[in-house]
């Protein structure tokens, strides 16, 4: 049930939002690969295309459809390479089916689409039908027309929820995600004329975690249900309950930023992702906020950023296909898949201070395998297979810096070839670079023991 939120917690949240609201949304970030073919938005034609493209993005922002959010950019890039401008004009799902299938085959050792991936072609076509029939091919002009009539963003959201597949009921949160991108100023796109004060925060699962930790949800068991290993299929179907929770979260957002409540939207996504499978209490929320705010002050930049695809190269300098690129990594990847373990592969990059490393720049660390459902003393587990002997000292140093700054929240398991053990113990006798050190020859047995414990 709703509870009193302390002033200290409100202040930490406001500070966090003010800091992280200047960060470009993961889906809008043009520093990530692959690059969008229509950027920059320096003409009406490119802005018009962006309005259509990002409606496709929002419609696919559904774990059941696309799995990891990075798949959306990668899938649409693949479909554009395959079909060109037909990704905006096709209204026949059959056209897209082959493209979705070829994407999965291409990305087999990188990531997987969601369980409802078979609906992706129909979702894309329903967006195109809406743009063609309702908006007459121009979403910016359509939105401007609604604005001139005195309509509000909620009216546009209602039109979308009636017309586009999987944008109704609880999925209408995706309408608000789209409208936030289209209406808010930079780092959003500001393509529509509506007033940002009329926006709502999209109640997606990460933001529901924040709401639950704040005590804003009506269901007292929500903090436990959000951390269930397997949430039932009907979990989101109580639309009235989640509408009420969305209203409370938005009321809270307006109390922080009355002229721009959706300013909290992406910061709360970041915070809610941090809270995945964590203790959803005000105490742990405050602990996390203080850590994130303090580290940002130290680093003067965000602690982490989300990645799409990280380029790797073979020995002759050629880019290799996305995914677990070494035999060792692929063995771990395949093992985790065979065990049904949920993991994120190279999905996040952490910022690290230089720590007197003799360099004048920040270090970064990209975990190979983050296992969000596994914890060790309340910390999320990272598996780091490393089979390259070159620069081993530098690798151990980077891992030790990561553990020094993030070890309160993450447990790092380093997996290495058996022949590396003695060298690692010589280079790092105190074990500062890992919580656990496993041999390649028996890491599967070690994992089973770890899992049971």
Give the location of each predicted region.
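HhH-family (HhH-GPD) DNA N-glycosylase catalytic core used in base-excision repair
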Residues: 1-311
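Interdomain/boundary linker segments immediately adjacent to catalytic/signaling cores
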Residues: 301-331, 335
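Active-site metal-binding core of divalent-cation-utilizing nuclease and nuclease-like domains
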Residues: 313-324, 337, 342-377
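Short beta-strand-loop-alpha-helix junction that forms the active-site gateway
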Residues: 319-320, 366, 370-397, 419-421
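Acidic-and-aromatic substrate-binding clefts and catalytic sites of carbohydrate-active enzymes
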Residues: 350-362, 389-393, 419-423
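Hydrophobic beta-strand segments of well-ordered beta-sheets in folded domains
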Residues: 379-382, 409-414, 435
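Short, charged, amphipathic alpha-helix that recurs within catalytic cores of restriction-modification
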Residues: 393-407
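Domain-level recognition of nuclease-like catalytic cores that cleave nucleotide substrates
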Residues: 415-453
